[in-house]
């Protein structure tokens, strides 16, 4: 299955690997499933318990998803995170969701990563903080409110 995922990551929605996984055409270690999504354990985990939330309907990214579906997915993320906390007792959790190649998206079917974190793990999700000024922040916040 690992090879199949790597070979199909850039295919279109007609041959989408995550559509096939979410709809049960490809076997997976399923943690949760309902009519909206399937939650699986990642076959290439960043850490033990690394889960993926994959909607059954194909959405390329967050920009194409309706707010109701997004809300349901985040509610499921909350429940999965609590289960990870209870079972694995991590020191933290990263919720990661990439949109577009520039953001690191490699499978163009919306999905959310829930990565349990441990004090001495080697997972990195960091960036160098940029700088801004109050005027720039004020202008941008006004533009985004439109």
PLM region spans:
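HIT superfamily nucleotide-processing domains
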Residues: 2-146
């Amino acid at each position: 299955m690992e090879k199949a995922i790597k070979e199909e990551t850039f295919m279109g929605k007609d041959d989408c690997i995550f559509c096939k996984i979410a709809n049960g055409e490809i076997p997976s270690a399923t943690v949760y499933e309902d009519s909206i999504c399937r939650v699986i354990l990642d076959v290439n985990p960043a850490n033990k318990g690394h889960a993926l939330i994959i909607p059954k309907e194909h959405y390329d990214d967050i920009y194409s998803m309706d707010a109701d579906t997004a809300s349901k997915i985040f509610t499921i993320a909350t429940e999965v995170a609590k289960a990870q906390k209870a079972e694995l007792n991590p020191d933290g959790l990263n919720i990661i969701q990439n949109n577009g190649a520039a953001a690191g998206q490699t499978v163009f079917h919306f999905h959310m990563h829930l990565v349990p974190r441990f004090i001495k793990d080697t997972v990195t999700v960091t960036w160098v903080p940029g700088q801004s000024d109050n005027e720039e922040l004020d202008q941008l916040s006004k533009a985004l409110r439109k």
